């Protein structure tokens, strides 16, 4: 029977000093026999996805204490990718994932906490906390702040001049701002309407993708990824998480039940999560994060597994930015993540024996929470929770219900396998002489007409140069924009490329151009945008050998990407580059701090999840 970790600092005569300090935090005699639960919050006023979390840690804490535990809250950092984007602030986003994981490890191990409730929401916070959970391997429940309501406005179509009702998100604000056909007044209207409430941005972007994947991993409660941040139903998720973690802690420490530990989800849960990701056309960043989380868990889940799954899993859900018809609030109305998992289960694509924090197995969870099979009216009522359309930064401030559920599996937001949006899923891994270790593309956002595309390389040595060239109309139809030395090591920090892809779209080149980078993309990206090219240029990857005018062929159906240059010519270029050193050909006015330089020294390429190369730390 494992001993409570907290006994290290609360039991025995020698710990009198530590207990004295614990008492100064409010603990009493009777508390020293209870599990100490860390409430890991990520409240910050910098991030709309986290601005409403301030009091929610104490909401969870009250439930923990009512269930017989001791709750102790602390905070991690949180970077807003949208605000950090388009300038050197984005260099810090991906590295912050590792800082978050480390900070959780430091606090939990330093104070010998027995279990955790992780209150996350946005892009790097959920994966950072998941990495920490796997590293620590103590009982954990995740609960997110929830998605933002989609924005809504009426806007004049710049071509037809008719007034159109439009659902909006952050990406619309970026695209319209770069489109000269819209007036300053139009841009201002969209800016004020695109992000109306607290919560993670309203499409299937990285934050929402990751919060949905925690459901498939079995580490959060049903609805975690989809019920909007403003809805009263989300309050119940926080309360249930607080009660549940005390039960899980007791099952592990008092009953020796290792199935409650996060690593017990095993390889099967990672396959389930990736299967869901492919089926819902999630952000390509999820690939990066799942690979990193699997490494922390000691699970051999690789790009090869992702490639294998991408060939057989259909796309069953299509949400912004891949369509302007649906947002996350619409996924919830259709039954949420449990409904997508239910359709995948009927297709034989899930491991339903994987454990969850709220049911013995995923199969048991689906029996209760899949709205197409449940007999529980409370579940159906839960999935009718909808947006109120009232701008607010207050959590749980409304109780609006959709008039009906979306149960249309032929033409609705969530489809059955027989009526899938596409037979192959929304993410794919490509390989070729330009990406020997692979690169990734969100096929859900690529028009079928350019699934096979051959174009001319337009080489840039940074995101800034790419943006400058696109806005100056130097990028033409048929070009493939190369953005290199933006990988984890070369950036450093692996910047997101949402601005260049948004500007390509605003220039009317969304179906006529491609972009290839060793950097990454925002979950808001769509179009033929191929990222995570590995090895990256700074690590000697062939993307660093491409020259202006080279022809490049992209073949998504056959999962290939090649620069159409002979092996002999590539070898000649490699020898030349080896002599010069693998650095950008043009100087970049970029401030790289000591912290970022330290990150660059240890980080590996994207195909390994951009995690640290721990072999470099061996004596």
Curated annotation (Swiss-Prot):
GO CC term (a single one): cytosol
Enzyme Commission no: 4.2.1.9
Which superkingdom does the taxonomy of this entry point to?
Bacteria
Q: How is the cofactor bound?
A: Binds 1 [2Fe-2S] cluster per subunit. This cluster acts as a Lewis acid cofactor.
The UniProt family comment states: Belongs to the IlvD/Edd family.
Q: What does this protein do?
A: Functions in the biosynthesis of branched-chain amino acids. Catalyzes the dehydration of (2R,3R)-2,3-dihydroxy-3-methylpentanoate (2,3-dihydroxy-3-methylvalerate) into 2-oxo-3-methylpentanoate (2-oxo-3-methylvalerate) and of (2R)-2,3-dihydroxy-3-methylbutanoate (2,3-dihydroxyisovalerate) into 2-oxo-3-methylbutanoate (2-oxoisovalerate), the penultimate precursor to L-isoleucine and L-valine, respectively.
Which HAMAP family is this protein grouped with?
Answer: IlvD (MF_00012)
Q: Spell out the protein name for this chain.
A: Dihydroxy-acid dehydratase
Naturally occurring in which organism (per UniProt): Paracidovorax citrulli (strain AAC00-1)
